[in-house]
């Protein structure tokens, strides 16, 4: 028997559903985090249009969360931190699709070394998205190196603003909590990585798609197709990263292909197989996986 390709199965699945099955648009809010780029690839290939799925772009993790709270999206992409915040308000929110695990993609940068920051009494200007996983990373940094939190001036900015910071005052102590691809511009401005989820921060950061149980039931077929085309997009990335980048580069401008490839090394795709060790860590973090597609 001939082997049926994944693409052919997806086409049969889509064609087997009447257009009326997808009359209502499924809106998903998403940032330009490298782990979510398969969604943009699927959009550019027209796969999302076929099942009436629309991406709503957000400039930050916190804005992404606010879009969902305001009813401007039916599902949102984010970390387990944003999930835990929203779950307090809406207990029926569930993770339904996994993208990646940060393995260096979330990081802390500075214009001073950790030793200099630790041994100083000067104030520290800390730039971050406060209502996001950024805050957890900064708190971990403060605790790990016994830094007096009274020295910290918390400055809430979205990542597009943060990435435009310039290292023009060498005496001023600046700490920046960011994530790929925004770290690239900061590196060019003279800031250096001092900690990351690969080096020094033992934090589990999972990127997933979340929605309410009722919404999942209502749009179940669309979510299932979304899962299939996202997996297909990740395979396309692994098979031909240049073609993938050229397809979605407008969303990442001004990131270069080389910088994009560097960023990919700082995440681990978990869309298909979950190692048992990771499942254990997720359970300890109270992250449910029973509804994951």
Task: Describe each model-derived feature in a short phrase.
Residues 22-147, 153, 174, 180, ...:
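Short, glycine-/small- and polar/acidic-enriched structural segments
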Residues 37, 43, 63, 67, ...:
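Extracytoplasmic/secreted proteins, especially bacterial periplasmic and envelope-associated proteins
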Residues 72, 77, 87, 142-145, ...:
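Sec/Tat-exported extracytoplasmic proteins
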Residues 81, 150, 154-245:
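Pocket-lining segment of extracytoplasmic ligand-binding domains
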Residues 217-292:
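Secondary-structure end/capping motifs
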Residues 46, 71, 168-171, 190, ...:
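Short glycine-centered helix-capping/turn motifs at secondary-structure transition points
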Residues 113-119, 136-137, 142-143, 149-152, ...:
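Proline/Glycine/Serine-rich low-complexity intrinsically disordered segments
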Residues 2-5, 14-54, 63, 259, ...:
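N-terminal hydrophobic or amphipathic helices and topogenic motifs
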């Amino acid at each position: 028997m001939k082997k049926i390709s994944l693409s052919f199965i997806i086409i049969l699945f889509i064609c087997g559903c009447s257009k009326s099955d997808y009359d209502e648009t499924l809106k998903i809010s998403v940032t330009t985090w490298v782990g979510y780029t398969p969604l943009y690839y699927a959009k550019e290939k027209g796969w999302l249009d076929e099942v009436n799925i629309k991406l709503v772009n957000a400039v930050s993790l916190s804005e992404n969360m606010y879009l969902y709270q305001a009813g401007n999206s039916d599902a949102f992409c984010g970390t387990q931190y944003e999930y835990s915040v929203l779950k307090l308000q809406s207990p029926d929110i569930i993770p339904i699709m996994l993208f990646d695990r940060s393995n260096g993609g979330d990081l802390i940068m500075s214009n001073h070394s950790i030793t200099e920051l630790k041994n100083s009494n000067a104030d520290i200007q800390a730039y971050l998205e406060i209502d996001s996983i950024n805050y957890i990373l900064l708190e971990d940094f403060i605790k790990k190196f016994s830094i007096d939190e009274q020295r910290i001036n918390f400055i809430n900015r979205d990542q597009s603003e943060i990435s435009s910071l310039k290292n023009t005052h060498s005496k001023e102590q600046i700490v920046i909590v960011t994530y790929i691809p925004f770290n690239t511009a900061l590196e060019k401005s003279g800031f250096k990585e001092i900690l990351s989820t690969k080096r020094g921060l033992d934090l589990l950061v999972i990127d997933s798609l979340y929605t309410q149980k009722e919404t999942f039931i209502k749009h179940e077929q669309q979510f299932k197709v979304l899962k299939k085309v996202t997996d297909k997009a990740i395979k396309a990335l692994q098979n031909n990263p240049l073609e993938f980048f050229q397809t979605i580069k407008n969303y990442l401008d001004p990131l270069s292909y080389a910088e994009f490839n560097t960023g990919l090394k700082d995440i681990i795709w978990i869309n298909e197989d979950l190692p048992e060790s990771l499942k254990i860590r997720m359970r300890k973090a109270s992250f449910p996986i029973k509804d994951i597609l």
